[in-house]
Amino acid sequence: SPLVHLTLNLISLSFVSIQFDDKQYYKPKFPKKYPFSFEVPKYSELERIDNHLNLNFKKYKAKLHISYFSLENDLKRHTESSRRLAFKHTSKANSISEIIYQNDERNVYGVKFDFDGSTATSTQFFLTDSSNHFFRGALYFNTQKSDSLAIIEEYLKVDVTRIIETFCWK
């Protein structure tokens, strides 16, 4: 079936039905100024805003906010800034896990931060080639954080992982 159907019991005798799309991906055409490519889910919409991109998951009321920077001997500044932005959520997080990513063949290295708890974001990451490029993403929901979002967060984290795994520099 084209849709996966899941029913969650949120509160006794109260149910919500969520229709998840099949996981299908494609590689969008990025403007030449962006020296990277990666796969995105077909149910997302790529929005270009100045030097930033958003990957909009309208159905799930979420956006992956994306930033790209050319490095000018400032890798440390960008990695520290990304870590600071991630750990800004420490007070609300039950835990923050760091997953190191390394793909020598594609010259892509980075860290993914997964948050558990009542944080504004459920996952953030950065990717770099360590010399010329720095790419950062942060997933935010356009709604109040609640336990009912947990299943959607996990569903979209799969997409973030796919972006990281298919990411390459041009």
Segments predicted by a language model, with ranges:
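Glycine-rich, often proline-containing surface loops adjacent to acidic residues and nearby aromatics
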Residues: 60-65, 134-138
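N-terminal targeting sequences that direct proteins away from the cytosol to non-cytosolic compartments
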Residues: 1-62, 75-79, 87-88, 93-105, ...
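Poly-acidic low-complexity segments
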Residues: 73-75, 129
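Signature of long, low-cysteine stretches enriched in small and polar/charged residues
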Residues: 83-136
